[in-house]
Structure formats: C-alpha cells, structure tokens
C-alpha cells in the first residue's frame, strides 16, 4: 500500500525577451576534451519535432482565450523541459521527451541532448548582425546536494549556471531569481515568478534574448495612426509602419490566407500569416510542420508596393502546468522520478512558468511577436495591409528553429 508523501518542490521558469540592448554570451564552447562530444546530430534533426511541439502548444494557448494575444518561445519551453529530463528516469523521462514530440525509437535520448547542445552552441556564436543569447540556470536549496553527473551534464550539454539559494526565505529567493531574469533580459521581464513555496528545493530557468534588424527598414516618418480591426465590432488605432520592398510572398487559396516573409540582416526571418476574414480558427487547427514546410517552399519574391505593418509591444506570462498535462506531460507534477538530480525520487515540479516579451518597430523585431497581412491587388500592384488579427513565426535560418510563435489579435494591448 502506497503511503502519501510531502514532496520537495521543483519549479521551472522559462522566459523570452528582447530589446535594443547589448547581450552577453553564455559560458565558453565545449572543448574536444569534454566528456560529451557533439555528434552528427544538429539543429535540423530536431526541427520537425520542435515545430510539432510549437504548434501543439500554440493551439492549447490559443484555445484558452481565442480573443487574446499569444506570444511565446516554443524553443525556450522545449529546452527547459529537455534540461529537466536530464534528471528524469523511467516513465518520467519517456513522457517528457515524447511530450516534446520526439520518437524515441528513431532518436535516442542521448542524441536529443546532443542536438540541444548543438543548438545552444549555434545560438550563442557572436554575431554583428543578430543579438541572440539562450541560457539555463539552476537555483538550488543551499544544503541540497546535486549529483555530480547531473551538474556536469547540465554544464556541458545545457551551458547551465548554478546558484545556491535559500528557499526557506521565499521572498528573498524570489528576488534573487527575478533579478537574475531581469538582468539577463535587460529589464524586459521583471517578475517571472510571482510567488515561491518555502518547500521549493530547486528552480530551473531558461531564457532567450533576441534582437534583430530588418534587412529593409521602415522609415519612422511614414508611420501613421491607422485603424486595426480586432473583430467585427471592435476597432483600435495603432501606429502603422509602411514600406515598399521586394520580399517572399505566397497566397494560399487552399487555406484562405496570405503570407509575407520579412528578412533580418542576419538572414533569419519573420513569417507573417494573415487568414482571410473568419478563417483564423480554421487555420489554427491546421497548423502542422508539414504545412509550414509547404508554405516556405511556396514563398516567391514579389514586389510589394505598399506593406502596412503595425508597430507594437506585447508581453505574456503563462502558468503551463495544466497545459503541459493536457499535452501528455503529467508525471512531473505528481509522481515523478527525478532521482537523477539528487539521487532521491521525492522531487516533483510545482510550477512551470513562461514569460515572453516582444517589441516590433521600424528597426526590426525585439523579442518575439505576431503580425498579419491583408492583400489588395490593383493590376500589378500588391498592397499588403496588416490591419486585422494575424500570426507570426520567427525562424532561425541555420537551424530552422521557431524561436517565437504568436498571434496578434490587438496590437494596442501590452
């Protein structure tokens, strides 16, 4: 007969942010002498699973409130959960990785971690054209002893920092973690954790910081207040940017949507997807990795004589416990085996929180966001009006990773 136990708690903090500031790279690259070698596994081999997870998580978040903005980093959530799985055993690790859409008969657990290691190394390469930093941190109760193997795997595979923390003083612990987050996001996310239990033993944090400039920038002198149609009976005024450029474009008659891709100076890109009026929920239901591949293969350079895109800044803060449970990741909250972290099997996850912030302006994308596109044709002229709800996917070219995914329903709401 099983007896009830009061388990120590573990929390996951996942955050994404970006703004016009300098960023700092993570710890140095892994040397050839490291215990864990990077194999032929690379970001592309993870792209399909990560994209599948991204769309599955998006659908869950969008269903909770179809009329709200959605912004999150699927890559950040994936990295945090994969990081957690380093310390999981048995059905717990299987549930986490299968929940992340990995087929463990095709991709062994070791290769998954090596793939994320490769992604982190790729993301944190210095660049003059892109500010991108991805990192992990462990905040651990002062007297808690972590297993040496977990510490080493966390450092080598996930570039993780570690900080002793007194969770028995939850306010001080919360301040320590939130200050770390605020510093790493240059003040963009100020309060990732709103509260912590004094029973917390461990907090894992993942962050993404992103800043990129458009290859063809908008002229601020041409930005004007314009109507944005939130719904049939609600209209708001937003600052609307405008531009004349040649850029990849595709009209999908089958799904009833229009796509425009804007490229950053780094050659990464933001894909804006505008469903026809009344088609948003139909389109959301059909989002799959295969659909994204079809869209990207169908994009062709076209001259857009007038592109109108709203300038906006939005934030989000999600508690993902219920959402992840609905996606099949349940054991971590109830009867987890996380004995690979401390050597005992009495840790459970108390909360998974995710914060995101996105600014889009004339210079480029800061963080992540969503934008949309409406199309008018007058003979050979193409006019793209982003004046109703739309989707956005920010994709990193080198790995085809979706670093941000979202929906902008109302650009005037922060």
Curated annotation (Swiss-Prot):
One of its GO terms (molecular function) is serine-type endopeptidase inhibitor activity. Homodimer. GO terms for cellular component: chromaffin granule; cytoplasmic vesicle; extracellular space. Serine protease inhibitor. It comes from the Eukaryota. The record marks 380-381 as: Reactive bond. Pfam families: Serpin. Keywords: Cytoplasmic vesicle, Glycoprotein, Protease inhibitor, Secreted, Serine protease inhibitor, Signal. It comes from Bos taurus (Bovine). Residues 1-25 form the signal peptide. SUPFAM superfamilies: Serpins. Glycans are attached at residues 103, 183, 233, 267, 321. CDD domains: serpinA3_A1AC. InterPro entries: Serpin_CS, Serpin_dom, Serpin_fam, Serpin_sf, Serpin_sf_1, Serpin_sf_2. This is Serpin A3-6. It is found in: Cytoplasmic vesicle, Secretory vesicle, Chromaffin granule; Secreted. Belongs to the serpin family.
